Amino acid sequence: GLNTLKKVIQGLHEVIKLVNNHA
């Protein structure tokens, strides 16, 4: 459902933050 989608999006944002920090 939407809650799962929101969690996935939040997870992607966290991954993007980590990638940006290591870039």
UniProtKB/Swiss-Prot annotation:
Pfam families: Antimicrobial19
The UniProt record lists the keyword Nucleotide-binding: no
Subcellular location: Secreted
Tissue-specific expression: Expressed by the skin glands.
Post-translational modification Alanine amide, affected residues: A23
Gene Ontology BP terms: defense response to Gram-negative bacterium; defense response to Gram-positive bacterium; innate immune response; killing of cells of another organism
InterPro entries referenced in this protein's UniProt entry, alphabetically: Antimicrobial_19 (IPR013156)
Domain of life assignment: Eukaryota
UniProtKB keywords: Amidation, Amphibian defense peptide, Antibiotic, Antimicrobial, Immunity, Innate immunity, Secreted
UniProt similarity note: Belongs to the frog skin active peptide (FSAP) family. Pseudin subfamily.
The protein's name: Pseudin-B
Organism: Pseudis bolbodactyla (Frog)
